Amino acid sequence: MIFKFSQKALVALYLVVGLAEAVPSKSRVVSRASTFDYNGIVRGVNIGGWLVLEPWITPSIFDNAGDAAVDEWTLTATLGQDQAKAVLSQHWSTFITQDDFQQIAQAGMNHVRIPIGYWAVSSLPDEPYVDGQLEYLDNAISWAREAGLKVVIDLHGAPGSQNGFDNSGRKGPIAWQQGDTVSQTVDAFRALAERYLPQSDVVTAIEALNEPNIPGGVSEAGLRDYYNQIADVVRQIDPDTSVFLSDGFLSTESWNGFKTGEDVVMDTHHYEMFDNYLISLDIDGHVKSACDFGKQIEGSDKPVVVGEWSGAVTDCTKHLNGKGVSTRYQGEYANNVKYGDCANTTQGSVADLSDQERTDTRRFIEAQLDAYEGKNGWLFWTWKTEGAPGWDMQDLLANGVFPSPLTDRQFPNQCA
């Protein structure tokens, strides 16, 4: 999650040139009775921080493990196999339950996106990770079926790390595409696909890989080749399953002409706190930026789902930039200027926000809902946290800041 939008900004200059010729804003994928039509509207939420840990979503787990635990790799290495398995099993069994899926459905969602790491299905020698996640993913599929929700299974971490972020399992240098890491990723993906794609009444899509970081050094040509391999795996197992492809921090239009008409959906992510310009905006600026992004993705020749976004406009949340890393907003990160004061907003509830903060958050969320439904919808990041109000859909819904019903608008026509 770190630097997501700022890295997108790095490539903005060349994204506007050399693009494919103009195409309709929506192209058709074949509709099938047993699956979801991704030419329609996805309304859903990510189950983040559950089967792949992130320090800012569950800071207590990482804080209790000591300073060295900054991602799932170092957490499990610090705790050791036995203690790590005990800690994670307790987390997996309590953080998300069937009741969460019922709440998500009752709020009007039709999808959940569930991140999973390669280590859950394909352990490699000399790695500290523990497994056991698949039992809970199995439960989640059953819970989704009972709740009437569709599932996107998201391969969130690859061997070597595809982005260098803690949400890949291991932060630091990007080593994916080195050695055997791509073939190892394909093997892990195939294991997931063989286990879950036959349940096509619920698992209607699977994501090839979350946020491969092209600006950070991932080869675009190599990524396209990997995507071709993944599509072949899916078609061999279940030709009716749609494949989500990350834009790799490029524009969705830069992927025009690639696998168009092959039941693929572009996944793009939009955050406004990981970029020095965006974090400086007032609420009017944030609304305009979200609306502009919605117009930008309309140029894709494939369905586009904004697969991650939030109601946050600062990086004040504890550990958001990484455990022990400071904030841009307060001018403490990478020689930033100061844009404001985090005050008591590093952790807490939506109920703790001021009236103005709740109003601004609601306005920003509504703008994004309208913008992203101009194409093919959205998946909010994330359902639940230990106290990150701009990111916690469950808490936002409970406090009337996330629209309920989803079409309710206190600030209509912001993107008109």
Curated annotation (Swiss-Prot):
Pfam families: Cellulase
Keywords: Carbohydrate metabolism, Cell wall biogenesis/degradation, Disulfide bond, Glycoprotein, Glycosidase, Hydrolase, Manganese, Metal-binding, Polysaccharide degradation, Secreted, Signal
Enzyme Commission number(s): 3.2.1.58
Catalytic reaction equation(s): Successive hydrolysis of beta-D-glucose units from the non-reducing ends of (1->3)-beta-D-glucans, releasing alpha-glucose
Requisite cofactors: Mn(2+)
Signal sequence annotation: 1-22
SS bond partners: 291-415, 316-342
Broadest EC class assigned to this enzyme: hydrolase
UniProt xrefs under Gene3D superfamilies: Glycosidases
Record's protein name: Probable glucan 1,3-beta-glucosidase A
Physiological role: Beta-glucanases participate in the metabolism of beta-glucan, the main structural component of the cell wall. It could also function biosynthetically as a transglycosylase.
GO function terms (MF aspect): glucan exo-1,3-beta-glucosidase activity; metal ion binding
Cell compartment(s), UniProt: Secreted
GO CC field: cell surface; extracellular region
